[in-house]
Each structure stands twice: as structure tokens, then as C-alpha cells.
Amino acid sequence: MVSFDVDGTIFRKAALTQATRSLGIGEKWDALDQMYHHRRITLRECLASEYKLLHGMKLADIIREVSKVEVIKNVRETVEKLQGHQIRVILLTDNPDFLCAYLIERFGFEGYVGSKVGIKDGIVTGEIETLPDKRLGLRKYCAWTGIPLSRCAHVGDWVNDVPVFRIVRYSVALNAKTEKVKASASHHIETDDLLDVYHHFQSIN
């Protein structure tokens, strides 16, 4: 199984952060990000507070803005090539499930592990269950599917991918933001084409 991070990996920038600027909540969203980066709130608190800002919004409006955010080249092609080798391809992210559902529909991913944000009649509700610990999320998913971590690879770009890198068999830091992330992965790649990751997997197999 191969899992892909979302922001900075599939999307070139943080998708919801970009979308909120057109939705009128960009300043509040950015302020929460800053509080987290200055360690005044935890990641769990940051995610919960950010997702509360979406309460009452139309899902269609959010997805419309998200769809404008640039994605890395050849996502569907990479997913399909991996699936051609009977490899399950999923998303592993702290982003909401509705964002994962959009990417599954657009690119053909087979599943996701992410935060849960309620939607009723096309409107975002206040029901929120965040996933600040992607490692825990992947462990649960592996237990549910019966796929051992020793048969998993993860592709990501940020510090919250590092704990995942440490428990899977193989990891790729893709366009990683820091040396720590690069050093924590089995391999690191700088590219604007996701097929380069597929070709790397082929070369090590």
C-alpha cells in the first residue's frame, strides 16, 4: 500500500488555507496557523478551530475554491500505474474527509485516512473529529484492512509525515520543506511530476 499526504504533496500549497482567502475567513485561519507555529496551541486545537470556521458554509463553495489550487502533475496517471501493480493507493492527511472525497473522485485514490467534518444537506456542520496524529490513523487503517505496516510506503513533505516515515517500510520526502523531513525519509525527491515517485518505486523494487 502507498499513502500520499495531501497539502504540499498532491496540492502544491495548503488547499484549504488557499481556499479560505476567497471564502472570507483567510485572516482568522492564518492567525490560527501562526498560533500553532508559535506553539501557543496544539495541532489538534488548531485543526478543530480552523474546521469550526467552515461551519455553516456550503460544501460546493469550498470545493469550488479548492479546485482552483494547483496540483502536482500526473496524479491520476501515478495512481493508476501503482494500482496496475495491485497496490492500494490512499490519502493520509489531517485534512477533512470531504477534501479527501473530492480527490478520490478526481484522481481515483482508493481510500483515505483523515479528519472527520460533518456535512448535512450540503452544509458543513459543527461535528468535528480531527486527526492530528497521522501515524495513529495509519495504524488503525492497517489493522482494519489487514495490510501490515511492513508492506506500506508513505509519500509526504512536512514534519507531521516524519512519525509516519518511521513506522512504514519505505518513505519518500517529496519537495520537503526542511532538512529534518528529508533526512527522516528513505529517499527524497524534488519534482513537479508525481510520476517521478512511481519511477523511483519501480527502481527499488
Which ranges hold each PLM region?
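Acidic, Mg2+-coordinating phosphoryl-transfer loop and its flanking beta/alpha structural elements
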Residues: V89, T93-D94, S150-D192
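Metal-dependent phosphoesterase signature
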Residues: R44-E77
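Substrate-recognition "cap/lid" segment bordering the active-site pocket of phosphatases
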Residues: A101, E105-C152, V162
